[in-house]
Amino acid sequence: MKKGILSGLKVLDLSRMLSGPYCTMMLADHGAEVIKIESPTGDTSRKTGPFKIEDYEKKWSGYFVSLNRNKKSIVIDLKSEDGKKKFLSLVEKADVVVENFRPGVMDKLGLGFNKLKEINSRLVYAAISGFGNPQFGKSPYTYWPSYDVVAQAMGGVIGITGPDKNTPTKVGPGIGDIFSGLMMSFGIISAIRIAEKTSKGQFIDLSMYDAVLSLCERIIYQYDFDKTIPKPEGNGHPLLVPFGIYKSKDGHIALGIVDNSFWKVLTNIIGNKELTENQKYKTIESRQHNAKSLNSIIESWTRTKTNKELGCLLGGYVPFGPLNTAVEIFKDSHVKKRSMIRKVEIPFNDKIKPWRVAGNPLNFSEFPQPDFKSAPSLGENNKDNIFEHKSEVFKKSKSSKLRKAFGSFATGVTLVTTRQENGTPRGFTANSFTSVSLDPPLLLVCISKNAQSY
């Protein structure tokens, strides 16, 4: 069985629906042991659909399967005393707890971060909510419930999406949830890095509103710099032209001309003298001011050719791509070669065909992506010996006296420092280290794997 880059990381996942499960999916895909802790009725997404035709009992929602592959499931009633005891026994051996309740819910259960860190001082506690935890700034909306569409609306993305200002449009995928989950996965790995060094965990807070606002960063600087209120641009760009979606003979294509070098290539391919000779289209700024007429000329050309023909003319020369539906994506050789659609077998139900889910886009040269395992049935791992051993992450990082003094670094790296009283450089070879924290900074010289201390 291939091990992922996060193998040994132990995660307790209390989250539901999309934001938290997407976060822990990213971790599980790369080898973390993620234990999904569910109420007796299970995650709501189990019932959301869609369902395969042969799944007569509707036990396997596509929504749930996609986000919860590679995870385990146990049922714990956190409102019961017995459930709390079970949960706390798992916390003792875990590295991370993830939840996406409203602020205060876990505290009311007696299971908030302050309680959990008494049991496990190195625990990383990750909390995603609509408007964030009050300790980092009390929002007037702190206790409002929130889902993706609310975050998209308040964070700014809907305000700049759609054909015009009178038709605000939600972005298709749940980016308010997904981007929040993705950001939190980064936060977790960052906090784990510190916990490995200091054995001290911490609380990570992420507001979905904040995450979407950071995604819409340009509306901040545009308004601040010249009081422009960014508005929906349809399929175009407020500053760059041509940049957007254009009709073709049999569909649509995307073009993204950012600088003049690509503009020259495009105009040579199109062969329209109006584009090459008219001063209105010479510079990025002039093209922006004449966007309507320019887009009309571009589309009058693209509409005469099929997507395949445009691919032959433009592909590899300018930023170009066809507009793909699910049908085209499933057929695309890029997707196949990059393993971006993964097959997941169902070992305990041969009546249901294997699922296919979106792959994980991260690739590591030293850690091939692990095989995807099935999403768990509700409480599938109740009888398993969950977290039989304490964290492998911290077991590997126990400090020797040398590590306490010098941190750790790669095998066979010689460290050279001027800490001798007479200023003469002294070196030693690091044989089992992963990080160094010294003052003054060290000059690092890789001599050889057999270099000796001197």
Model-derived segments and their meaning:
Residues 64, 233-238, 243-244, 352-355, ...:
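Short Gly/Pro-enriched turn/cap motifs at secondary-structure boundaries
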Residues 181-201, 214-225, 267-274:
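Oxidoreductase and adenylate-handling cofactor-binding alpha/beta cores
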Residues 236, 241-323:
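Aromatic-enriched alpha-helical interface/lid elements that frame and gate functional surfaces
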Residues 315-368:
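A glycine-rich dinucleotide-binding beta-alpha-beta segment and adjacent secondary-structure elements
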Residues 133-134, 165-175, 196-212, 231-238, ...:
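Conserved Rossmann-fold dehydrogenase catalytic segment
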